């Protein structure tokens, strides 16, 4: 695993990488799951503080606003697919199972979201909501080779791999 008391610069770096990968994994997971929860009213009704949608119907309308260039008939399907993807990615990242793949797909999903936000609402929208930063973080997580406190780590350790 890793030592909690670094004895040299390499140990300190390993601790920082391990902490960062766990922190980033959880931050992305909870961000995906929180956004999904908002669509189903878990955080309250539309108009309440920190509630973006409050209902799935409002999220579908927002999906249509961002994807104005797509045929209207595809918007509900896109909203459902993106919600399913965010739910699955959120749980995969939370558990640390197939972490690299989940992080890569999460980075792509967030990048597409940032691009459509910029096209529909202007460049400040994805910048103000740190969507490009989250996408970059997901891509960085996908580049990690170790995932402490994860199913991936448990599976690797139980298989005897180094």
Describe the residue ranges of each PLM region.
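Extended, low-polarity transmembrane helix blocks
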Residues: 1-58, 65-68, 72-88, 95-162
């Amino acid at each position: 695993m890793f030592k909690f008391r670094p004895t040299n610069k390499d140990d300190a770096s390993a601790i920082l990488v391990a902490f960062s990968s766990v922190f980033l994994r959880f931050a992305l997971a909870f961000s995906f799951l929180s956004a999904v929860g908002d669509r189903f009213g878990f955080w309250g009704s539309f108009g309440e503080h920190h509630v973006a949608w409050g209902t799935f119907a409002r999220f579908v309308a927002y999906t249509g606003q961002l994807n104005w260039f797509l045929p209207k008939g595809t918007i509900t399907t896109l909203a459902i697919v993106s919600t399913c993807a965010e739910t699955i990615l959120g749980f995969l990242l939370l558990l640390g199972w197939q972490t690299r793949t989940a992080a890569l797909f999460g980075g792509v999903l967030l990048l597409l979201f940032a691009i459509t936000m910029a096209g529909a609402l202007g460049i400040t929208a994805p910048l103000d909501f740190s969507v490009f930063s989250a996408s970059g973080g997901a891509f960085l997580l996908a580049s990690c080779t170790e995932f402490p406190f994860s199913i991936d780590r448990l599976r690797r350790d139980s298989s005897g791999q180094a």
